[in-house]
């Protein structure tokens, strides 16, 4: 059985306190279900998550913060698969980097553009991205806040698959492939 967790905060699925708390609560609820063998993390509509809610910038952080959500995804009792359409940016990409497998629709856009706003990716993206794609590719993205399309993301190893229907594709990933994958944070540093 698969569990689907959807980020649903139109128009761009910006990650705010309610989304962070909802993700942690959903993961905790699923942890007690022995029938679930994979979790699919997707965005409602045509966007995965366009990053943190800029309306919360400068406000005191309310728990759980995004690093706690990333840690919960990465330590989930079953593999989590990111199924992205549209924007998978900033905190959205950091959520995807915490997943064991990443699938994107051909029109997806992936990156850590928050540096353009003077914000450093603060939820492990600067550590996980180089471990996954290598230092050269990571340095072509992070310092300039450059975003890339699915084809390039697949080429550099940021995603594992491209599919028109990422959620359906996530259901078809062989369990052995998921089990063989270690968390990105445990990959060797470049």
Which positions does each model-derived feature cover?
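STAS-typified acidic loop motif
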Residues: 1-21, 48
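Short beta-strand/loop segment at the start of cytosolic alpha/beta domains
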Residues: 1-9, 26, 31-40
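Hydrophobic, secondary-structure "cap" segments at the distal end of domains
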Residues: 126-136
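Glycine-rich beta-to-alpha active-site loop
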Residues: 72-117, 121
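Amphipathic alpha-helical segments at domain termini/boundaries
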Residues: 1-6, 50, 94, 98, ...
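Glycine- (often His-adjacent) and acidic-residue-rich active-site loop
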Residues: 35, 42-72, 88, 116-119
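Terminal peptide-recognition signature
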Residues: 5, 22-23, 41, 53, ...
């Amino acid at each position: 059985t698969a569990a689907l967790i959807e980020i649903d905060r139109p128009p761009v699925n910006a990650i705010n306190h309610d989304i962070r708390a909802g993700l942690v609560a959903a993961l905790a609820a699923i942890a007690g279900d022995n029938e679930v063998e994979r979790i699919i993390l997707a965005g409602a509509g045509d966007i995965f998550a366009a990053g943190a809610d800029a309306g919360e910038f400068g406000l005191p952080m309310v728990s759980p913060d995004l690093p706690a959500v990333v840690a919960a995804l990465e330590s989930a009792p079953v593999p989590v698969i990111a199924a992205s359409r549209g924007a998978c940016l900033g905190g959205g990409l950091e959520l995807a980097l915490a997943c064991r497998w990443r699938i994107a629709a051909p029109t997806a856009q992936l990156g850590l553009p928050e540096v353009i706003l003077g914000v450093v990716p603060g939820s492990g993206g600067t550590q996980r991205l180089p471990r996954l794609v290598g230092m050269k590719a990571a340095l072509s993205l992070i310092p300039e806040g450059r975003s890339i399309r699915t084809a390039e993301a697949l080429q550099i190893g940021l995603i594992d698959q491209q599919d028109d229907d990422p959620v359906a594709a996530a259901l078809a990933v062989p369990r052995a492939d998921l089990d063989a994958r270690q968390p990105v944070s445990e990959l060797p540093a470049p």
